[in-house]
């Protein structure tokens, strides 16, 4: 309607007379701490899928970035430890995302490794194979791969991580995007990377 009015195909901007439709945020599923433990403890028929899913929970990486992640993109982090230095597939922006020692252990990191980190992983596995694994873990929520990113944001927030640190670690341009899920100094980002664990304490 706005385009029609702008092009003078109609005389009146109808939008001026329409009531704004109020939208509600649709609740999205994420894993609780206990559910994350269960998932980590449950075998998956596609081991590389399990590793990728848990890595996403620990780092907030999207499936597109998981699929394209190369070993050489894991580099030294200025505040200590390692980080992923990558071009985010969705936004095409350069990002630095710190990763915990546990996440490095999970993927079997070694500086000598080359090529894809999750070699052999198929996007299609995030459908039926992943749903079966989640069901076997006793989780009844509607979990998608993107739910792992939401899990990261929610559990970081619950652990007391500052929202701007979460925003930075998730490579969000706007803090409102981060708020719907649930630049900071490197030391805070590094500390935050260790706050989500797959091991019961």
Segments (PLM) and residue ranges:
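Conserved tyrosine-mediated DNA breakage-rejoining catalytic core shared by Y-recombinases
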Residues: 19-23, 29-35, 59, 68-107
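Basic, Lys/Arg- and aromatic-enriched nucleic-acid-binding interface segment
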Residues: 6, 10-63, 67, 199
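C-terminal catalytic core of tyrosine-transesterase DNA break-rejoin enzymes
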Residues: 6, 54, 58, 65, ...
């Amino acid at each position: 309607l706005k385009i029609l009015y702008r092009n003078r195909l109609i005389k009146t901007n109808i939008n001026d007379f329409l009531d704004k439709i109020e939208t509600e945020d649709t609740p999205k599923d994420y894993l609780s701490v206990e559910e994350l433990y269960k998932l980590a403890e449950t075998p998956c028929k596609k081991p590389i899928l399990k590793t990728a899913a848990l890595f996403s929970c620990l780092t907030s990486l999207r499936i597109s970035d998981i699929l394209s992640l190369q070993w050489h993109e894991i580099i030294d982090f200025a505040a200590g430890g390692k980080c992923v230095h990558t071009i985010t597939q969705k936004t095409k922006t350069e990002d630095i995302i710190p990763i915990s020692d546990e996440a490095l252990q999970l993927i079997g990191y070694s500086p000598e490794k080359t090529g894809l980190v999750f070699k052999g992983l198929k996007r299609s596995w995030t459908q039926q194979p992943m749903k079966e694994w989640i069901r076997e873990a006793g989780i009844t929520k509607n979990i998608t791969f993107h739910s792992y990113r939401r899990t990261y944001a929610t559990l970081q927030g619950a652990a007391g991580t500052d929202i701007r640190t979460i925003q930075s670690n998730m490579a969000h341009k706007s803090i409102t995007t981060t708020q719907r899920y649930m630049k900071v100094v490197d030391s805070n980002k590094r500390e935050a990377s260790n706050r989500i664990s797959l091991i019961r304490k």
